[in-house]
From Swiss-Prot, chain B:
SUPFAM superfamilies: ACP-like. GO terms for cellular component: cytosol; membrane. Belongs to the acyl carrier protein (ACP) family. Keywords: Cytoplasm, Fatty acid biosynthesis, Fatty acid metabolism, Lipid biosynthesis, Lipid metabolism, Phosphopantetheine, Phosphoprotein. The keyword Phosphoprotein applies. One of its GO terms (molecular function) is acyl carrier activity. This is Acyl carrier protein. The lineage of its organism: Bacteria, Pseudomonadati, Pseudomonadota, Alphaproteobacteria, Acetobacterales. The keyword Lipid metabolism applies. It comes from Gluconacetobacter diazotrophicus (strain ATCC 49037 / DSM 5601 / CCUG 37298 / CIP 103539 / LMG 7603 / PAl5).
Amino acid sequence: MFRLDGKTALVTGASGGIGAAIARTLHAQGARVVLSGTREAVLAAVAGEIAPDGERVHVCPADLSDPAAADALVSAAEVAAGAPLDILVNNAGLTRDGLAIRMKDEDWNRVMEVDLAAPFRLCRAVLKGMLRRRAGRIVSIASIVGVTGNAGQANYAAAKAGMIGMSKSLAQEAGSRGVTVNVVAPGFIQTAMTDVLSDTQREKLLGGIPLGRMGKPEDIAASVAYLVSDEAGWITGTTLNVNGGMAMP
Amino acid sequence: MSEIADKVKKIVVEHLGVEESKVTPEASFIDDLGADSLDTVELVMAFEEAFSVEIPEDAAEKIATVKDAIDYIEKQKAA
């Protein structure tokens, strides 16, 4: 089950921990994967680690803060892969945290641009072909804070909540063509950023997670692999909360 | 039939997968040719691409039949 042989997937933000894990998992399920991100050297390293022989793996760097980059990326990815995109995983994102009363417009706008407008443009670009081919899978990686909110992240939470509303709308627009659009909302994932927490901070954090541990990038990757599979063909417009039980919206 | 009419017809046949004989000038995309709202948007986008014209939203809304499309594109091309 959940095999992706013959499918081509574009994963943005593939140089990061979660993105790399998603790319690795989709590749392991048989998909041809195109890795995108801003850091070309890191992408190349991830690609080399996924498939040392370069089999079914391609690198297409892109800076999604440039509005023209999304269309260009989809074209470049299809050329690199030599096939139309069956799967889009919107994973790229960034944060510019700060309490609202001190948040600059620039920090609000940058997060909206990269975390919400760019995924929209990528969806729009891939949907044209998917609608024509009567098949396709889009999964966007949001965040638990898009559902619960979080002090210090008004911009990021708004962008991630926006991603959920956008995906529900696209799911309704594309449903009649067999294209599904879903969201995965991760909770706390163990990364370099959470590794530096103090023991007290960590204990407090874990106290709020019924499953008693932080998530691994692979926990997110597995849910993406499921949602992009043929078997998940009757699931659309949903948000899968992968957070150890920290929030149960 | 004009070259534009031929090309419009071909796009409609290809996109909606209907018999060529059904694509008469009076045929309505939605009522006669089985298109849904998404099809009509895709058709307009296909026309835009094929004829290198821009069809704004308010004009696109008025294109209901094959003849509407041909007339609009002929007018744009003549302008």
